[in-house]
Amino acid sequence: MSLSLQERGEVFELWVSSYFEQVMSLDLVTTPFLAARNVNRDPSKLRTLERMSKDELDGTMDHGVFARSSSILLRVVPEVLYANCLRALVDTEGVWRDVDVLLLWCDESMHDCLWASKFVAELARAPPAEGKQKRQIEVERLEGANHFVSTTPHYRTYRT
């Protein structure tokens, strides 16, 4: 049985707003680890979309945004994207040379968020290229949160 495009979108929205089993360290994040990781079934960890009223959802969700903005990322040449990531996150010789990076990663977030966080954490630990000064990158864990801002009280984010 296959799902329509709309049904796939609905399933994706529920999956992406889920809380997953907690990850204590980004060092644990590997492909097999993520493949074996499950949605957290604790009743207090109800999916974000299941906790929001219809009015809240209608006021915050834009189902057409993917087609307008994010889908272009699927067509980017990976080498170009990687070079741009390095330039933005590490290079202090370009624009905003005095800007530091603070990555907040959520330990119950979906797999892609953890993988990206691990990537940035590895950049932070890597030595600078020869003759280069590297941007300061800090990586902090938000405990008990998924990647939806509404699930983490704002004071916790500001305090971190």
Please give the residue ranges for each predicted region.
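Short amphipathic C-terminal alpha-helix that caps PH/PH-like domains
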Residues: 15, 158-160
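Active-site-adjacent alpha-helix of alpha/beta-hydrolase-fold enzymes
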Residues: 110, 114-135
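Short, conserved active-site loop motifs that form the nucleotide-linked donor/cofactor pocket
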Residues: 101, 137-138
